[in-house]
Every structure is written in structure tokens, then in C-alpha cells.
Regions:
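A short, amphipathic alpha-helix used for macromolecular contacts
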Residues: 2-52, 76-93, 277
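Mobile genetic element proteins and their domesticated derivatives, centered on retroelements
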Residues: 21-22, 36, 47, 79, ...
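RNase H-like polynucleotidyl transferase catalytic core
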Residues: 60-67, 124-127, 221-224, 238-261, ...
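Extended, low-complexity cationic-aromatic segments
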Residues: 72-204
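C-terminal anion-handling pockets and recognition modules
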Residues: 92-93, 262-354
């Protein structure tokens, strides 16, 4: 007798989990497979199979800035100001330069590696996890575009500069003799140092790299951190005027890192490349971060600007809140098809809010 057709019906019946009981378990008891299985009174293997089938999904919840009513109202107005209501699309954002600071660390406390079967596991040590070597950088980027006058692509990576100082070693050590220049990171950035960085680094870089920089008003968007200067800062405006630049300093809404392309994704891309290096001192760390900044393709930056436009759309639909999922529009697929837009079209749902 041929029983091959009955093969799928053999073995014990599958044990399913009542999915309605999953949501009844408090979230703080659903942090691991072990605790979730214990709360549901099921074996871990049964729960794991449900996760593998997609019946239960894992989720990583990250803290987001708390927003007041005024914060949310400011976010809505800021996002609406980037929409061309007549054409029903977002502005191209070609006249905006985003600036922001970020700490870059020598290494992460926890790193993941893929090892061979017999390979020895790496052993990493540090004197203190709290005081890891780090350097703060200021980055300035804009929307990539084709430079018609130079007939080439302008990547719009204005620059990346470390907040550091060079001191002379006062005494000898096993690493260097007395009198050797030693690079040290600035522990905290003040408004004086921030202003100097804008005047002596950012503005000259804009004048050098930006095509037809004197023919348009360039907005420099910053967040509301305490060391940042006021939009009407006379020293900055005077320095821009001497360079022949028409610069306007603008502030993004408070508690809104998601409205800056650097915080939205570009810093993470730099950091991912930087951690592929293995710096052993501050000079090597600075070089690794600067090399990562230069290696990133301009298309990555352009994609983050398109994501920013979708984030602004979500922000308005959420009435200024930040309880949304970062939308995906298959940018790489659209690019391969030659259909990647310069600006995102306003959805019908968003038009009703304008």
C-alpha cells in the first residue's frame, strides 16, 4: 500500500499559542523569550516556533524626546513650511545646510563578531567603561545635486571637523618624550568654540565648495543645544558678509532630532564605517571618522533627505508627535528604475491637514 500521500498528516499535532493572551501579559514581562514563555505558561520552544512563523514579532523600543504641546505645534509649522502647497510636493531643500555635533567613540562596549568554528574569541579590555576615549565632531551637509557650471556631481558633504586641541607634553612617558605635540579632545563645547567653528571652518568650506554661493540665500539649520548661537549673531553675519555669503541661521524645533538629516541617519552611516577601523589613539580615531565621512556615497545622503521629507509628512499627520514608524519608499528600487523623485508628493491624507 502506498502511503506517501499521508506523510503530511503524521506526527503529533502542532501546539498553538492563544495569541489573544499574549497582549494581555504586561509589557515588562515580555522582554525575553524565557519571561514571555513563563508568563504564557508555554515551553520556550513553542514560543520560539510561533516567533519564527511570524505569529509573534519582536520589537526594540527606543526612548524618544518628550514633546510639549508647544513643541508639537512648532514641529507642525516647521514641517508645513517645507511644503509647496501650489504644486503639492515638498521643497527640494537645495538651499539648506544641516549642521550638528556628535560624539564618536574609540570602540563600543559590546561588539558582535562572526568567528570560525575553532577561532579564539576576542578578549577586549578597558580601564573604565564610563570614560571611553571619544571626540566630538561638527558635521555640515546639504542636498546633493548636479553642478552645471562645473559639469560634475556636487556631493554636498561640506565638511566634518573635530573639536580638539594640541598640547605639548610636559613630561616623558613610554609613549612619547617631553615636548611632543599631543592631540586632546575638547571635553565640553561652549558657544565660543561653536561660533569659532562656524566662522573659521564651516563658512570658508561653504564658500569654497558651494556652486554660485554668493547668488542665493543659504540656510544653516541647527538644533537648540545650549552652546549654539542665536540666528542674529553679529559675528557670524559679519564673517559671512566678508566672504560674500548670504547666510541665514535657522533653528529646528526643540526636541526634534528627527528633523535633521544628520541625526536621522547620516551619523549612523558614518559610525558604522568608523567601527570597521581599529583606532588605538585619538589621532587614529579622528582619521577613521574623517575617512568614513569621505567614503560615504552622496546617494546615501540624498536618500536621507528623501526620508526626511517622509518624516515631515508623518510628523504633520501625527499632529507634531514622534510616535510614527520611519517610512520606507523603496528608494534603491526606484533609483534602479530611474524613478527616484527629487521631492516627495503630498499624500491626499496630508492635503486635508494643510
Amino acid at each position: 500500500m502506498n502511503v506517501e500521500s499521508r506523510k503530511s498528516n503524521c506526527g503529533r499535532k502542532r501546539k498553538d499559542i492563544d495569541l489573544a493572551t499574549v497582549v494581555e501579559v504586561p509589557l515588562n514581562q515580555r522582554g525575553t523569550v524565557r519571561s514571555t514563555a513563563s508568563a504564557l505558561s508555554v515551553p520556550k520552544s513553542t514560543l520560539f516556533r510561533s516567533i519564527k512563523r511570524g505569529e509573534i514579532r519582536s520589537h526594540s523600543s527606543s526612548l524618544k524626546p518628550f514633546l510639549t504641546e508647544k513643541n508639537m505645534a512648532d514641529r507642525v509649522e516647521f514641517c508645513k513650511s517645507h511644503i509647496n502647497t501650489e504644486r503639492g510636493i515638498f521643497h527640494s531643500m537645495m538651499d539648506v545646510i544641516h549642521v550638528d555635533e556628535k560624539w564618536f567613540y574609540m570602540t563600543k562596549n559590546t561588539r558582535k563578531y562572526y568567528l570560525g568554528r575553532e577561532e579564539e574569541e576576542p578578549h577586549r579590555t578597558t580601564k573604565s567603561k564610563r570614560f571611553s576615549t571619544k571626540v566630538m565632531f561638527l558635521a555640515a551637509v546639504a542636498r546633493p545635486r548636479w553642478n552645471t557650471s562645473a559639469n560634475q556631481q556636487f556631493d554636498c558633504k561640506i565638511g566634518l571637523w573635530p573639536f580638539m586641541k594640541v598640547e605639548i607634553a610636559k613630561r616623558s612617558s613610554r609613549n612619547r618624550p617631553t615636548g611632543t605635540p599631543v592631540t586632546k579632545a575638547v571635553d565640553s563645547v561652549t558657544n565660543v568654540e561653536y561660533r569659532n567653528m562656524l566662522i573659521h571652518k564651516v563658512l570658508p568650506a561653504i564658500r569654497k565648495k558651494w556652486p554660485n554661493s554668493s547668488a542665493m540665500t543659504i540656510k544653516i539649520q541647527q538644533d537648540n543645544a545650549r552652546p549654539h548661537i542665536a540666528p542674529s549673531d553679529p559675528e557670524l553675519l559679519q564673517a559671512a558678509s566678508l566672504l560674500g555669503l548670504n547666510v541665514k541661521l535657522v533653528c529646528q524645533p526643540p526636541n526634534s532630532p528627527d528633523l535633521n538629516v544628520l541625526d536621522l541617519g547620516f551619523f549612523n552611516s558614518i559610525q558604522a564605517l568608523q567601527h570597521q577601523a581599529a583606532p588605538k589613539n585619538i589621532d587614529e580615531l579622528i582619521s577613521a571618522v574623517e575617512d568614513s565621512f569621505e567614503q560615504l556615497h552622496w546617494k546615501k545622503l540624498n536618500n536621507v533627505f528623501l526620508t526626511l521629507q517622509k518624516v515631515m509628512e508623518c510628523c504633520i499627520l501625527c499632529d507634531g508627535g514622534n510616535q510614527y514608524k520611519i517610512p520606507h519608499v523603496s528608494k534603491q528600487k526606484l533609483e534602479r528604475a530611474g524613478q527616484l523623485p527629487v521631492s516627495i508628493e503630498v499624500s491626499d491624507e496630508l492635503k486635508q491637514k494643510l
